[in-house]
C-alpha cells in the first residue's frame, strides 16, 4: 500500500526501501526547501528525543546531532562559532546544572 511522505530522509533510505522489495520515488530539493526541511527534521527529531525512553534516548540524540551538524553545514555555520556562543550563553545566563524550575515571576 502506497504511503505519501513528502519529507527529508537520510541518503540511504531509498536504497533500504528498495532492498526490502518495495518501490519509492525521491527528488532532490532546491537549497531553500532543503534548509526548511532540515529545520522541520530538527523539530521532528527533538520531539522523538523528548518522547524516547532510556533505551532509545542515545539513538534519538544521535539523530538530533546529525540534523544539527547538517543544518550548520547547509547554512555555512562554523561549529566553533556555535560552541563559542554556547559558552557565552552559559556564562551570561547559566546552564541547567542546578535543575531549576521557574514557578512564577513578577
Question: What are these regions, as identified by a protein language model?
Answer:
Residues 1-106:
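Flexible "arm" and connector segments at domain edges
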Amino acid at each position: 500500500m502506497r504511503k505519501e511522505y513528502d519529507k527529508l530522509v537520510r541518503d540511504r533510505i531509498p536504497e533500504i526501501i528498495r532492498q526490502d522489495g518495495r518501490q519509492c520515488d525521491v527528488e532532490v530539493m532546491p537549497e531553500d526547501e532543503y534548509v526548511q526541511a532540515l529545520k522541520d527534521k530538527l523539530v521532528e527529531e527533538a520531539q522523538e528525543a523528548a518522547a524516547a525512553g532510556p533505551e532509545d534516548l542515545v539513538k534519538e540524540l544521535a539523530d538530533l546531532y546529525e540534523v544539527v551538524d547538517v543544518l550548520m553545514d547547509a547554512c555555512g555555520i562554523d561549529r566553533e562559532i556555535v560552541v563559542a556562543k554556547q559558552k557565552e550563553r552559559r556564562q551570561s545566563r547559566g546552564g541547567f546544572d542546578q535543575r531549576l524550575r521557574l514557578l512564577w515571576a513578577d
